Amino acid sequence: MTGNNNSDDNSNSLKTKWGNRFIIAAIIQGGIITGMALGTVAFQLLTTDVDIIQFLSLSFEGPAKWFFIGIILYLILIVAIATTAVFYNHLEINLKRKFSKVSNILAWIHLFGMNIGGAGTTILMIFAGLAGSGVLSLFVEGKLGNQDVAILTSFIPYIAFFIVILSIGVICGGIAYIMAYRSKA
């Protein structure tokens, strides 16, 4: 085709390594939450005694809110990772900025920190909500357990640990972005 300069076959086509990495990460994270959702639906289909989502919805004032907040934050994380890919794409393609050795290291920390810290935080919140609401007992023992608000306290240090990893990743990403933005095209 004439006039189409965006073909992958074109050796002069522009590429974005960091944009691609973050898009792939967003796709993987989307796959993880899809797997979690399908697992919950499959378990619900096999367990007709309790409507898991209805139970969690009715007990939203208790530990179950951690489940829903974890799910919502996980979805926000996926959108944030994809949005980050757009920022890196803008730097690498539109502004034609190059990453130095240091900014590459910071971008790697950003990628891992955002994905490990963000996913760890949200998955632990989801798990804490299931454990504290008694729904986890349904998966493990086959019967609905008692609600236990105190169990949430045991998750706080681990959630905080993953939040620190997430924060370090995002801060390093911001520094990498500024360094690349200020570099010459």
Regions found by a protein language model. Name each.
Residues 1-23, 185:
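N-terminal juxtamembrane cytosolic/stromal segments of multi-pass membrane proteins
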Residues 2-5, 98, 142:
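Juxtamembrane inter-helical linkers in multi-pass membrane proteins
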Residues 19-96, 106-184:
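Hydrophobic cores of alpha-helical transmembrane segments in multi-pass integral membrane proteins
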Residues 12, 96-98:
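Membrane-water interface regions at transmembrane-helix termini and the short interhelical loops
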